[in-house]
């Protein structure tokens, strides 16, 4: 049966130490390709808040993602331009559960 690509395994990013120490939160919108075997390749930053702080950590994390590949006519196919947003937020019991850093919603 044909089917869309489905995320199986998403590795949480490593929070950059300097950003954590300074209390900086943010997010990165990534674009990448899901391969025929369900791995990811060629991650690119589409935008980031704040720019340049979390880009490398987000790309490293996305390269470890695993997907069930997309199936068309019984064959696995590569899917370019898959987008995902990776949010970096500091755990704080005082924040609501659905809290998102400014500029990331």
Task: Give residue ranges: language-model regions.
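Short proline/glycine- and basic residue-enriched helix-capping loop/turn segments at helix->loop/beta transitions
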Residues: 1-33, 57-104
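A short, conserved beta-strand element enriched in hydrophobic/aromatic residues
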Residues: 31, 41-50
């Amino acid at each position: 049966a044909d089917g869309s690509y489905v995320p199986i395994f998403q590795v949480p990013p490593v929070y950059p130490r300097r950003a954590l120490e300074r209390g900086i939160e943010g997010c990165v919108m990534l674009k990448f390709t899901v391969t025929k075997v369900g791995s990811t390749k060629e991650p690119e930053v589409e935008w980031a808040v704040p720019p340049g702080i979390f880009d490398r950590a987000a790309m490293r994390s996305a390269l470890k993602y695993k997907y069930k590949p997309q199936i068309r006519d019984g064959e696995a196919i590569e899917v370019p331009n898959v987008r995902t947003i990776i949010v970096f937020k500091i755990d704080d019991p005082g924040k609501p559960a659905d809290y998102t850093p400014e500029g990331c919603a």
